[in-house]
């Protein structure tokens, strides 16, 4: 059987907090926790999904490329968000297919570009709104900072986008004073000063 590990960020690195062997497609972990925390489930050395380690019975389902975590309030919220994001990602993929179809159907490049740009901008705004609303709704629990930091980790180096600025500007102090967020914001501002 394969080994699964639950890892959480601590002092700048990922630390194993639990592990289990997968036997006949099933595994079980148990433990005590002081407060909810964002974690990643790893199979061997590969991260396969994010989850919230919190009090309750957490159900993890991995089948046919679909990963879901449910059974606790924050995981239900997280995976509702993931489902909405996946739906937008699917629509983005469809826009790329539409572009090819329009070209094959003999539409002018100008017509193709106008339509595709409009669709991409619409999707981009929907994605930004989804992320912003989710983080703002979850400022006060582990999901807001967790998703914000995942978003930040997607950049090659710390920087601030208009979306990140808006999220931070409206955030309560508890969010802004989160150690990792504070560190990111300081690094992003230092990078901005270096560029100016």
PLM-predicted stretches and their roles:
Residues 129-135:
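A short, acidic, amphipathic alpha-helical segment used as a generic capping/interface helix at domain edges
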């Amino acid at each position: 059987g394969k080994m699964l590990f639950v890892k959480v960020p601590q002092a700048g690195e990922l630390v194993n907090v639990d592990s289990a062997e997968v036997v006949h497609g099933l595994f079980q972990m148990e433990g005590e926790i002081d407060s909810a925390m964002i974690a990643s489930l790893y199979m061997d050395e590969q991260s396969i999904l994010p989850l919230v380690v919190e009090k309750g019975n957490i159900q993890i389902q991995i089948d046919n490329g679909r990963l879901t975590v449910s059974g606790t309030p924050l995981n239900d919220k997280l995976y509702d968000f993931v489902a909405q994001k996946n739906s937008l990602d699917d629509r983005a993929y469809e826009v790329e297919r539409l572009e090819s179809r329009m070209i094959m159907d003999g539409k002018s490049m100008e017509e193709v570009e106008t339509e595709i740009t409009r669709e991409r901008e619409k999707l981009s705004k929907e994605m930004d709104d989804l992320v912003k609303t989710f983080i703002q709704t979850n400022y006060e629990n582990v999901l807001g900072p967790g998703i914000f930091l995942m978003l930040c980790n997607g950049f090659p180096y710390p920087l601030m986008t208009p979306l990140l600025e808006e999220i931070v500007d409206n955030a309560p102090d508890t969010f802004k004073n989160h150690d990792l967020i504070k560190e990111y914001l300081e690094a992003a501002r230092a990078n901005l000063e270096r560029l100016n």
